[in-house]
């Protein structure tokens, strides 16, 4: 069984993998990092004009890192907007995914948080730098193989 968007992508020859539906019936797709930017632009043109959220997670210690995008198709007069969940997996050794900041501006802080916590580099992001941790912090705190430092000194501002 395929979802509506997956069938549309297949019809237009766009490479993806259908992962199923979540508990709310939202279609979930996997897109390769090298295809993500062009498919993101196509999804925006198709009507997915709102990035509801972006998050990231560590799939397994030593394994892949995932960047997850929840997109919504908002139209006037529609009570139940169409939603889709996109997952983009990147290798741990060189986790690079194209930024969608230039497609959905709301990706700005969300991609920065994913970079800060998991070390996923979002190519072509205009301000990719730490947003929660100090600039001097070493490592990526939400990776499953992260070893927390025994001590970290936060210096006073004065």
From Swiss-Prot:
Transmembrane segments: none
Catalytic activity as recorded in UniProt: a plastoquinone + NADH + (n+1) H(+)(in) = a plastoquinol + NAD(+) + n H(+)(out); a plastoquinone + NADPH + (n+1) H(+)(in) = a plastoquinol + NADP(+) + n H(+)(out)
This enzyme's EC code(s): 7.1.1.-
Claim: Transcription is one of the keywords in the record: no
SUPFAM superfamilies per record: Nqo5-like
PROSITE patterns (alphabetical): COMPLEX1_30K
Entry's Gene Ontology BP terms: photosynthesis, light reaction
One GO MF term: quinone binding
GO cellular component terms attached to this protein's record: chloroplast thylakoid membrane
Keywords: Chloroplast, Membrane, NAD, NADP, Plastid, Plastoquinone, Quinone, Thylakoid, Translocase, Transport
Locations listed in the record: Plastid, Chloroplast thylakoid membrane
InterPro entries: NADH_DH_suC (IPR010218), NADH_quin_OxRdtase_su_C/D-like (IPR037232), NADH_UbQ_OxRdtase_30kDa_su (IPR001268), NADH_UbQ_OxRdtase_CS (IPR020396)
Membrane-topology descriptor: Peripheral membrane protein
Assembly and binders: NDH is composed of at least 16 different subunits, 5 of which are encoded in the nucleus.
The protein's role, per its UniProt record: NDH shuttles electrons from NAD(P)H:plastoquinone, via FMN and iron-sulfur (Fe-S) centers, to quinones in the photosynthetic chain and possibly in a chloroplast respiratory chain. The immediate electron acceptor for the enzyme in this species is believed to be plastoquinone. Couples the redox reaction to proton translocation, and thus conserves the redox energy in a proton gradient.
Family named by the database record: Belongs to the complex I 30 kDa subunit family.
PANTHER family cross-referenced by the UniProt entry: NADH DEHYDROGENASE [UBIQUINONE] IRON-SULFUR PROTEIN 3, MITOCHONDRIAL, NADH DEHYDROGENASE UBIQUINONE IRON-SULFUR PROTEIN 3
NCBIfam families per record: PRK12494.1
HAMAP family on file: NDH1_NuoC (MF_01357)
Protein name: NAD(P)H-quinone oxidoreductase subunit J, chloroplastic
UniProt source species: Manihot esculenta (Cassava)
């Amino acid at each position: 069984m395929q979802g509506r968007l997956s069938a549309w992508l297949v019809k237009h020859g766009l490479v993806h993998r259908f992962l199923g539906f979540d508990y709310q019936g939202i279609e979930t797709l996997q897109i390769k990092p090298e295809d993500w930017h062009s498919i993101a632009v196509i999804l925006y043109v198709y009507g997915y004009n709102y990035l509801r959220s972006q998050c990231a997670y560590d799939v397994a210690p030593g394994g892949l890192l995932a960047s997850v995008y929840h997109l919504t198709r908002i139209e006037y007069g529609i009570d139940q907007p169409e939603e889709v969940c996109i997952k983009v997996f990147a290798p741990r050794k060189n986790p690079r995914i194209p930024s969608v900041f230039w497609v959905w501006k709301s990706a700005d802080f969300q991609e920065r948080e994913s970079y800060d916590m998991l070390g996923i580099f979002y190519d072509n992001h205009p301000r990719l730098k730490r947003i929660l941790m100090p600039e001097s912090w070493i490592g990526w705190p939400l990776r499953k193989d992260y070893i927390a430092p025994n001590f970290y000194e936060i210096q006073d501002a004065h």
